[in-house]
Amino acid sequence: MSEVLEAPARPALANFIGGEWRPSVSGRTYEKHGPWRPSEVIGELPASDEEDVNAAVAAALAAFPEWAGLPAAKRGAILNKAADIVETRAEQIAQDMTLEMGKPIRESRAEALRMSQVFRFYSGEGLRPTGERFEQMLTGSVAYTVHRPLGVVGLITPWNFPAAIPAWKVAPALVYGNTVVMKLAQEAPLTGLHLAACLEEAGLPAGVLNIVIGRGSEVGTPLVEHPDVKAISFTGSVPVGRGVREEATRLGKRVQLELGGHNPVVVMADADLARAVELVYAGAFWSAGQKCTATRRIYVEERVYDEFRTRLLERMESGVVGDRTTRPRRSGRS
């Protein structure tokens, strides 16, 4: 069974800074090629650099006082409306996701809806009480804590989950009153541009969310180093994450990292081998293994090693390799 995916309607292939869709300051661009066919050019995108980062941070800094002063419930309401918009555009978002990074359309559709779910969940945080109250020894005295936004935060996202991970980072940052500069992965920026367009339509004020597209060394590094960026959240490889941590902590910024994993499976002799094979297969080949939770090692009890190995190889041989037009159940294998 095949399904030909048409080119979806999409936002401008541009940076999103101060509520405007902009080319890079330098005017430089790069070609985004399809993962299935390297000769397939999806579009031209801005090859941004430090000047674009500076413009985005300036826009976020200018928008921060008014956004932080807005009641949290109103910030949450914008996220809730954005969730509605994402749901109406889920198919467009899913098609662009598969087009740009190769995930089977079934997985992309689920992830597009996940973006909506994340927005919906964090919209509720705008109504949740925060802070604590502490009784004191002195009569008439009370101590309490309140939560305050940090200011401008920098978010750096990977290409393998281009809807879910940006949503996980953006939604909490916004509902708690921060403004955002986000660097999307150069390999998969289209999905994140949909995220920005949905928030813009939901009424997010200009400058609250800014997106800059480009290489890590030309966009990520100046974002981490910018003096007006108070915190960094990075998802990516261990070597790059270590560099982000060292530089951010040296500059006194808050930093959060989600780095690559190396995940094992243990198969005991009394395991249901048929189920174990399916779980290992799914863990290794969902999204072609391009995720931090993918199965990379298998430890099998010696008594069942030969049987398990034979079954797993048979399962791998039964997989179907397909491109985005053939709707494989798994990326690379199905």
What function would you assign to each model-found segment?
Residues 1-44, 77, 131-156, 256-259:
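Terminal low-complexity tails and localization/encapsulation signals of metabolic enzymes
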Residues 64, 68, 83-90, 94, ...:
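Structural signal for hydrophobic packing residues in well-ordered secondary-structure cores
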Residues 19, 39, 75, 97, ...:
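Residue-level signal for inorganic ion chemistry
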Residues 231, 239-334:
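ALDH superfamily catalytic-core signature
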Residues 38-129, 140:
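Glycine-rich loop-to-alpha-helix module at the N-terminal edge of alpha/beta enzyme cores
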Residues 42-48, 63-69, 155, 265-268, ...:
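Short, well-ordered beta-strand elements within core beta-sheets of diverse protein domains
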Residues 131-275:
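Rossmann-like NAD(P) dinucleotide-binding subdomain of oxidoreductase/dehydrogenase enzymes
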